[in-house]
């Protein structure tokens, strides 16, 4: 996780989705083609149904981060160790329990979203 930049969304319309774990924002097609740079264990590029499970079109705000490790905003949003890219400020729905268990198995942190 971290050093190679994530794909930048090719469109900023209604087709944007955010990863429910890391909050990376890309289009559905980008998740289908390359998966999530921060969450490769979801294997979205192999299982296209998983994209709908682990991403959401419902999110608030977008921040672009070029150097997450040096950005106070990235650290405040808890994305300081993720790949440079576009992230949402907040998602309003949790990752499905099955995927939360997968995160535990992979020993990666998952923080439930705050109530909005």
Swiss-Prot record:
SMART domains: Spt4 (SM01389). The keyword Metal-binding applies. A zinc finger (C4-type) spans 19-39. May regulate transcription elongation by RNA polymerase II. May enhance transcriptional pausing at sites proximal to the promoter, which may in turn facilitate the assembly of an elongation competent RNA polymerase II complex. Belongs to the SPT4 family. Pfam families: Spt4. Keywords: Activator, Metal-binding, Nucleus, Repressor, Transcription, Transcription regulation, Zinc, Zinc-finger. It comes from the Eukaryota. SUPFAM superfamilies: RNA polymerase subunits. GO terms for cellular component: nucleus. One of its GO terms (biological process) is regulation of DNA-templated transcription. Signal peptide: none annotated. One of its GO terms (molecular function) is zinc ion binding. Transmembrane segments: none annotated. PANTHER family: SUPPRESSOR OF TY 4, TRANSCRIPTION ELONGATION FACTOR SPT4 HOMOLOG 2. CDD domains: Spt4. This is Transcription elongation factor SPT4 homolog 2. Its main location: nucleus. It is found in: Nucleus.
